Amino acid sequence: MSRICDLTGKRAMVGNNVSHAMNKTKRKFSVNLIKKRFYLPEEDRWITLRVAASTIKTINKNGISAVLKKAQTEGFIK
């Protein structure tokens, strides 16, 4: 399973490890994914999603319904 957020499409970024001598080696910054259940009051059911921690903060701020609707318009959910 790829490490991609179900709602925002966030995926790993590539960067550098930089030593004190400024030597650079490639590395990967992975997404902080969490498997979480959300309750949809409109449909009276629970859904399980793999979302980034930053997405959970967005859901707490805007609500699950608004975030799901935005994810559908951006094409992350069918």
Curated annotation (Swiss-Prot):
Keywords of this protein's UniProt record, alphabetized? Ribonucleoprotein, Ribosomal protein
Sorted alphabetically, the Gene Ontology cellular component annotations on this record are: ribonucleoprotein complex; ribosome
Q: Name one GO biological process term.
A: translation
Q: Which cysteines are joined by disulfide bonds?
A: none
For molecular function, the Gene Ontology terms on record are: structural constituent of ribosome
Query: Where on the tree of life does the source sit, at the highest rank?
Result: Bacteria
Q: Does the keyword Ribosomal protein apply?
A: yes
* Listed InterPro entries: Ribosomal_bL28, Ribosomal_bL28/bL31-like_sf, Ribosomal_bL28_bact-type, Ribosomal_bL28_sf
**Which Gene3D superfamilies does the UniProt entry name for this protein?**
Ribosomal protein L28/L24
A Pfam family of the record is Ribosomal_L28
Family affiliation = Belongs to the bacterial ribosomal protein bL28 family.
Q: What is this protein called?
A: Large ribosomal subunit protein bL28
Starting at the broadest rank, the lineage of the source organism is: Bacteria, Pseudomonadati, Bacteroidota, Flavobacteriia, Flavobacteriales
